[in-house]
């Protein structure tokens, strides 16, 4: 992660409590598919890289794996430690993981690879993986095929600027024939997050570049989100945010 990206993430994701509250978990089908593809079984050593508040970490622990977590943002590490006091948590980044060579069987990354310096991160992931070890990537993405979601996403996109984002797919450029990993595989699982208006507002506010907006600008944006809900979902106290969960995996070569 470049210093500029780290600074943005460190500020934008500082409110670990909001992130934990607002972001959805991963659907069981996505976790099962990733565990099968990456060979995650009881006793295997798995690194959750850029673990955040531990949403993916908890799923990996439930699979019976020996899980450790690397996370650069202090607020995220605090939430992670509170929820999973028994696991090893290391302050580090994807480009400087801080573990020994060939020390883990699988590296998992949830909602984060697009933040990394891709080539440098893959080189470091290659280093800490055992020969033939696996990398798994997962993202929960709001389903823009739904009309009201598309309107909310357009509002969000106005404020994105040069910030890294998954849907732009620039992150995939790191997976070249020379990157040390086999061809990236992909699968899609659908998901939904039940919320009320306050929950949707929290979800939007948990986005790094939204969290760093000036208070007045952020307040205007949130009122626009409320207006969309009132227009598109009239009278619905609770509703579901539809998601597409994208999972990717590959294996270390050499």
Task: Walk through the language-model features, giving the residues of each.
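Conserved class I S-adenosyl-L-methionine
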Residues: 1-41, 55
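Nucleotide donor/acceptor-binding cores
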Residues: 43-44, 102
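Class I SAM-dependent methyltransferase SAM/SAH-binding core
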Residues: 45-47, 53-96
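A short acidic, Gly/Pro-enriched loop at the edge of an enzyme's catalytic core
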Residues: 95-106
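A short beta-strand submotif of the Rossmann-like class I SAM-dependent methyltransferase core
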Residues: 109-110, 118
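A short, conserved alpha-helix within the catalytic core of class I
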Residues: 116-124
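Conserved catalytic/acceptor-binding region of the Class I
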Residues: 126-195
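Conserved Class I S-adenosyl-L-methionine
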Residues: 173-254
